[in-house]
Amino acid sequence: MSHFPYDAVLFDCDGVLVDSEPITNRVLTAMLGELGWRLTLEETLRIFLGKTVFDEAPRIQAETGYRIDDAWIERFRARRNAALESELEPIPGAPEAVRALHAAVQGRIAVASGADRVKLRLQLEKIGLQDCFGEHVVSGQEQARNKPWPDVYLAAARTLDVDPARCAVVEDSVTGARAGVAAGATVFGYSPGGPGHSDAQALLDVGVVHVLRDMRELPAVLAGWQAR
């Protein structure tokens, strides 16, 4: 990887580094059911994948008559975090890929996620990657606009003092991929199949240049990538 083609690598977290979407959305499904909106886990994933609860607050209110407020979000996050603490596992191959890429770009890696910072720290610590990212963890909820706007990726590039156009982004959702593309980065997709990730064609349709099914392939794919 001596001639690595990117100055930095920016990772989404949920569904890229950690297999959190089924856990988070199971909790969300239960809590929406308590409000009267009865969904299957697959339906919840389809609606909320790559988004925050607040993104869909108008729809929740339309379906339940309940206006999502800060108190409800606090209860949701508490239940979600307890489930993540108990059950969370890394995406297979992700820790090894992160450490390999950390070495390839001399530590210039960052997390750029739409999730809240407490969740990000919990998840990175749980899978043993907090040390790799250090302070280079950016939450879209702390930006003026969250994904699909590019703000979180632009902010992550700034923390590393790199040009976004010289960054590779790794995403698994259409919402996140749109953000990376809008930031001017080269976006690679991860879509292993099954619920919890956008499908490969949907990612390609929004500007992703290549989709992986196995995260273990990521370092070699990025190292050998040439613009086509």
Map each language-model feature to its residues.
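Asp-based, Mg2+/Mn2+-dependent phosphohydrolase catalytic module
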Residues: 1-7, 99, 105-106, 116-228
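N-terminal helical cap/lid subdomain that shapes the substrate entry/recognition surface
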Residues: 2-103, 121
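Electropositive, surface-exposed helix/loop patches at the edges of structured domains
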Residues: 75-83, 108, 222-228
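Conserved SAM-binding loop
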Residues: 17, 90, 109, 169-170
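Conserved G/P- and acidic residue-centered "switch" motifs that form tight phosphate/ATP-binding loops
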Residues: 12, 16, 113, 172
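Residue-level marker of regulatory loop/turn positions in helix-turn-helix DNA-binding domains and
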Residues: 90, 112, 145
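Glycine- and other small-residue-rich loops at beta-strand/loop junctions that grip anionic moieties
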Residues: 46, 112, 192
